[in-house]
Amino acid sequence: TNARFAWQHQSGGEIVDGQTLPCADYASLADAIGAYLARLGRPAPLDCAIAIANPITGDQVRMTNHHWAFSISALKAQCGFDRLRVLNDFTALALALPHLPADELRQVGGGTPVAGTPIALIGPGTGLGVSGLVPDGRGGWIALEGEGGHATLGGRTDRETAVLRQIDVQYGHASGERAVSGQGLVDVHEAL
């Protein structure tokens, strides 16, 4: 698990100075932020946004795939940010979708894309990230936050059902995340 940092001098400006720091090298997120800033020789920015692979349901955040835990308000004070926004990583990715150039988009499935309709985002990693956007009726978008990777999977064929049954026995639940993620792909391969 890594923490990826970058700097943006102004809203809408170029994103520069990207660096990846192994989470295991730092006792806390604040320590990793401090190390990144020290490498750049910069003070803390006034505004900071953090996208994290974790549900954000309040001030307290405990990472699901690493030992870091923190209070958003305490992190803001400790790092000296004027504003701090912490959101789920796939919610952040979904919010970026309308800003992608057309050559970065890929049609999945049949049919023709229709502008201004809901957009889905799904991606495997340590878990299965899921998010999406729905039109807000005013030309903007509303991000859908959730942990869709935990939805139960059902097989369509006898073979799929047998694979999912084995995953269910192993974990107590056959979810999307248990089948479509780094470890999930290994488990599906072994079940086959």
What is each of the regions a protein language model found here?
Residues 95-121, 158-163:
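A gly/proline- and charged-residue-enriched helix-loop-helix capping module
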Residues 1-14, 119-137, 185:
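Gly/Thr-rich phosphate-binding beta-strand-loop-beta motif of the actin/hexokinase/Hsp70
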Residues 1-35, 144-150:
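Short glycine-rich, Thr/Ser-proximal phosphate-binding strand/loop in the N-terminal lobe
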Residues 41-86, 91-104, 121:
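Short beta-strand-loop/turn "lid" adjacent to the catalytic site in phosphate-handling enzymes
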Residues 150-192:
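Active-site rim beta-loop-alpha module in soluble metabolic enzymes
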Residues 101-104, 137-150:
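A short alpha->loop->secondary-structure connector
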Residues 31, 73, 92, 128, ...:
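Residues on a specific face of well-ordered alpha-helices
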Residues 40-44, 113-116:
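Glycine-rich phosphate-binding loop signature in dinucleotide/nucleotide-binding domains
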